[in-house]
């Protein structure tokens, strides 16, 4: 989960600049994540967090497939077309079935797949994911990289996962997805940052990627606050 960064001079590459911008605006998400991890009713909060994560992650592959289609529809001479489509071609298979992992984790704590799939995602989750479709379909598919940079850029540490496991008392299976993302996302983050550094973006495209990323910080933080708000702390 994200941690706050200190101010510094913006670096030069596209990926490094985006990461710098994200680090500067992470405060709301850091605070929401800390409130989740340290919530006195974590046994009730954690399953809701897994459900919310499932609602978000089950949309990732369809969203990236849409972005790939839109990238391939760009003019052949567009300098973003081929590297963006190639990146998504490679990354989509890496993200397959992660939503199923979360359903497995929830089953490990007694919550059935059917009950999760019946739940209505919050309006905030719909905004978080739906905004990306707007950027991809009505502006430029490169904007989705800002969203991916946030979701895969701040994996949970082993220590944090151990703390959650200890405080909830849930079986290890309930933390499988968190642990796998903790292992995988650092590599995914580095790959994305390097790819962004190699892109030739217009100033407008660079702005779209940044806005996509930064609005996602606020909406993801709000999604966590929403689920915490369902369970007032007792005592």
Q: What residue ranges belong to the model's regions?
A:
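Non-heme di-metal
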Residues: 1-235
């Amino acid at each position: 989960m994200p941690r706050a960064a200190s101010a510094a001079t913006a670096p030069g590459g596209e990926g490094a600049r985006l990461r710098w911008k994200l680090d500067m605006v992470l405060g709301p998400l850091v605070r929401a994540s800390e409130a989740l991890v340290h919530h006195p009713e974590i046994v009730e909060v954690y399953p809701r967090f897994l459900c919310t994560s499932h609602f978000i992650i089950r949309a990732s592959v369809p969203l990236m497939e849409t972005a790939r289609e839109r990238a391939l529809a760009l003019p052949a001479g567009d300098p973003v077309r081929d590297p963006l489509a190639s990146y998504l071609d490679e990354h989509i298979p890496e993200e397959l079935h992660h939503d199923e992992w979360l359903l497995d984790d929830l089953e490990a704590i007694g919550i059935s797949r059917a009950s999760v799939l019946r739940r209505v995602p919050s309006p905030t989750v719909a905004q978080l994911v739906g905004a990306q479709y707007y950027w991809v379909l009505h502006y430029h598919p490169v904007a989705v990289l800002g969203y991916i940079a946030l979701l895969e850029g701040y994996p949970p540490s082993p220590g944090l996962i151990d703390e959650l496991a200890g405080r909830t008392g849930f079986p290890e299976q309930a933390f499988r997805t968190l642990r796998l993302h903790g292992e995988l996302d650092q590599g995914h983050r580095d790959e994305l940052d390097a790819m962004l550094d190699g892109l030739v973006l217009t100033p407008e495209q660079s702005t779209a990627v940044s806005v996509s990323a930064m609005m996602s910080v606020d909406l993801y933080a709000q999604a966590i606050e929403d689920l915490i708000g369902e369970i007032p702390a007792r005592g």
